[in-house]
A protein has these predicted regions:
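Short, conserved glycine- and acidic-residue-centered signature motifs
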Residues: 3, 217, 531, 535
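Acidic active-site catalytic centers that drive phospho-/nucleotidyl reactions
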Residues: 6, 40, 199-202, 501, ...
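Phosphate-binding site recognition
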Residues: 14-470, 482-487
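Structural signature of nuclease core domains in nucleic-acid processing machines
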Residues: 446-573
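Exposed loop/turn and edge beta-strand positions of beta-sandwich/beta-sheet ligand-binding modules
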Residues: 5, 57, 496-498
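Short, conserved active-site loop motifs that form the nucleotide-linked donor/cofactor pocket
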Residues: 7, 114, 556
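Single conserved hydrophobic/aromatic residue that forms the stacking wall/gate
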Residues: 1-13
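Conserved catalytic motifs of the protein kinase core domain
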Residues: 6, 112, 193, 499, ...
């Protein structure tokens, strides 16, 4: 009977939710077409981005943001606003904020020929397939401008060149000159320089890094962008979006007209992702005001410039899914780079990653011009990549004299914590074993914990030679992180007369707290049991349980673990 009542209540709540949604606009899940988004769906107005651009008018603007933060929709907004067409596209803006800004801004509406390319779906396994996709994209953009076929101002040769690329027939050299050619033809036809918009320009570059055709794609993109964006007399303005700046690869070599807006810059900081006000307005519209705190805990936490930002993809999916929280963002694309980082990380970096998993901040040098190969070649570049790709947030920024930054970074929210846990455990193929270890900790079964730890180390650690106590500390932090929904996990904090290794502070009253102390030796003659007993004695002598007791935790389990190579001995106090 209780189950039947609960089920009826769930059905009733779901029905109320669906009826409420039926009265309101639909949520734009996966909609990147501006006209469609503004006419048939709930649209968060980002049109003041146009005002900010026209106030400064940099020749070429590059916006670097994580995936699924509204880049494609914003670029299509720019296309619809600026593009000269037979349709009166001002109707899409007259009820938007940009239209209230005055004639200085609105006079630009519908006045420019526009070239628009998005590389977001160029994800092939070989260079040959990648080039075919790029050539097809170029061909489709030429076809979109079929007014050039009947243009009275183009020469026969220019029309021949148009048909070559429109017909998907050009070779690599022809396609590399595609932007330059199309901008020339449009300038000549309309009598006005054109705007070039390139969305997700670095998607095929990341794919090239992953699938070993990196030199080919970088060489192609360098020539492609140089022809269209560098010293091009047919260019009015250019816009690019991507995850990385990729400056060091000379893709934008010598392009002095390029202005980059990264996640650390104040410019355009509120236009990619949702602000707090925008999220609250959306929740109010759908009658879900009471869900703000939960939504914030899961999907807030990003900081672009000085603006606090929510993940827009996850916010929309959360509200659409009857406000049931889960990791929506992790299913939007591959996380191979995270796995690559975990596989190649040094023991020190592994320990830092586990600290992040436990909710701690770490200090990191951030280079927003990080490139994909550096993830393998320079281990400390991983924090730069994780930050710009959306896997970390900035807590504090300390500008450096070389133009880069020292930052305190942390995992932004619950959703990204799930992504880390999934990738960490999947990469070691030890998901179920790690869960068993966490269960052994929770059930205080030291014999089982000892056996599982040794099994885990044998199966998941390729080389233990030279590992120090910090390595095992980091490994244990990661395993304890699975208990994060039951415990607040602290590491290397002062308590009593010293600093404990790991503390598990229960989130629910009445549950036991845990103190861990680790010892390590390389000496084959050292008795691990005696070493583990020494760890327990240290917990007692140093009064590491002081903080737990001060917080009202009465049941405290002390665990001492001694490591040597892939062996462990566990003692419980």
């Amino acid at each position: 009977e209780p189950y039947r009542r609960q089920r009826q209540m769930c059905i009733r709540d779901r029905t109320i939710h669906m009826n409420h949604f039926a009265k309101n606009k639909s949520l734009p899940i996966g909609v990147s077409d501006f006209k469609l988004a503004t006419t048939g769906y709930y649209y968060v107005d980002k049109t003041l981005m146009i005002r900010d651009f026209l106030d400064k008018k940099p020749m070429v603007s590059l916006f670097t943001r994580p995936r699924r933060f509204g880049k494609t929709l914003n670029m299509d907004m720019l296309r619809v606003f600026f593009e000269k067409t037979n349709e009166d596209t001002s109707v899409y803006f007259k009820d938007k904020q940009i239209w209230q800004c005055g004639d200085y801004y609105t006079k630009h509406q519908g006045q420019y020929p526009v070239i628009f390319l998005t590389f977001k779906d160029v994800k092939s396994m070989t260079w040959e397939e990648t080039f075919q996709k790029i050539r097809r994209l170029i061909s489709l953009e030429f076809i979109r401008h079929n007014e050039l076929e009947t243009s009275s101002v183009l020469t026969a040769y220019e029309k021949e060149q148009y048909h070559l690329l429109a017909g998907d027939s050009g070779d690599e050299v022809d396609c590399q000159m595609g932007l330059q050619l199309l901008s020339l033809l449009l300038h000549k036809h309309y009598g006005r320089e054109c705007i070039i918009i390139i969305d997700e320009y670095d998607t095929p570059i990341q794919q090239g890094h992953t699938c070993n055709f990196y030199p080919e794609i970088v060489n192609f993109m360098r020539n492609f962008f140089s022809g269209g964006l560098k010293d091009n007399p047919h260019l009015a303005f250019g816009f690019l979006t991507g995850i990385l700046r990729v400056a060091k690869e000379s893709i934008f070599s010598g392009m002095n007209n390029l202005k980059t807006y990264s996640i650390l810059d104040d410019g355009y900081s509120s236009y990619f992702g949702f602000t707090e006000k925008e999220v609250k307005d959306m929740l109010r519209y759908y009658g879900k005001d009471d869900k703000y705190n939960e939504l914030s805990e899961w999907y807030d936490g990003y900081r672009f410039g000085n603006t606090e930002i929510f993940n827009p993809w996850s916010v929309i999916n959360y509200i659409s899914d009857n406000c049931f929280p889960k990791a929506f963002w992790q299913s939007t694309g591959s996380n191979e780079i995270i796995g690559e980082i975990i596989q190649t990380a040094t023991p020190e970096i592994t320990k830092d990653l586990y600290k992040l998993l436990c909710g701690e901040k770490i200090a990191a040098y951030i280079d927003t011009g990080v490139i994909y190969p550096e993830v393998q070649n320079n281990p400390y570049s991983i924090y730069s990549f994780l930050l710009v790709a959306g896997y970390l947030k900035v807590a504090n920024i300390y500008p450096q004299s070389d133009g880069n930054f020292m930052c305190d970074v942390a995992i932004p929210n619950k959703e990204i914590t799930f992504v880390y846990e999934k990738e960490v455990l999947n990469r070691t193929n030890q998901n179920s074993l790690a869960i068993s270890i966490s269960q052994a900790i929770f059930s205080k079964d030291t014999q089982k914990l000892q056996s599982l730890l040794e099994d885990f180390m044998v199966k998941s650690i390729s080389s233990i030679d030279g590992a120090n106590e910090g390595f095992y500390h980091g490994m244990m932090l990661g395993l304890c992180a699975i208990l994060g929904n039951r415990y607040k996990i602290r590491s290397n904090r002062e308590s009593g007369l010293g600093r404990f290794d790991i503390q598990l502070m229960p989130l629910t009253k009445g549950m036991p707290g845990f103190i861990f102390e680790f010892k390590h030796t390389k000496d084959e003659h050292t008795d691990l049991s005696a070493l583990a007993d020494g760890a327990l004695q240290q917990i007692e002598a140093k009064k590491y349980d002081t903080e737990l007791r001060d917080n009202g935790v009465n049941s405290i389990i002390s665990i001492g673990i001694a490591f040597r190579g892939k062996s462990a001995v566990v003692r419980r106090g």
